A protein has these predicted regions:
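Intrinsically disordered, low-complexity terminal tails
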Residues: 1-89
Length: 89
């Protein structure tokens, strides 16, 4: 879990997740929203690439963003906690 930021948060009353890991040549971000599902974002010297497992989300994001959005069937979090979070505090 070294060098991975793991931030659960609430968006529109739904649990979401932000994870980020800095590598030598790129930054990797994992986002999970209940509306879009999982998104993987890679930022490197070539620019920003976004990956989603869903064709409809890919189409929507390609229409609204100026980044390369591709479909990738299996997007995994950078790591998974073995215990549940208490979002209510």
């Amino acid at each position: 879990f070294e060098n991975i930021y793991h931030i659960p948060f609430i968006f529109e009353n739904k649990s979401c997740l932000f994870q980020m890991r800095k590598r030598a040549k790129y930054l990797e971000i994992y986002l999970y929203f209940s509306v879009f599902g999982a998104l993987k974002i890679l930022i490197d010297s070539q620019g920003v690439s976004i990956f989603t497992p869903f064709a409809k989300v890919q189409k929507f994001l390609n229409e609204h963003l100026d980044f390369n959005v591709s479909q990738e069937n299996k997007i995994e979090p950078l790591f998974v906690f073995k215990r549940l979070f208490d979002f209510k505090g």
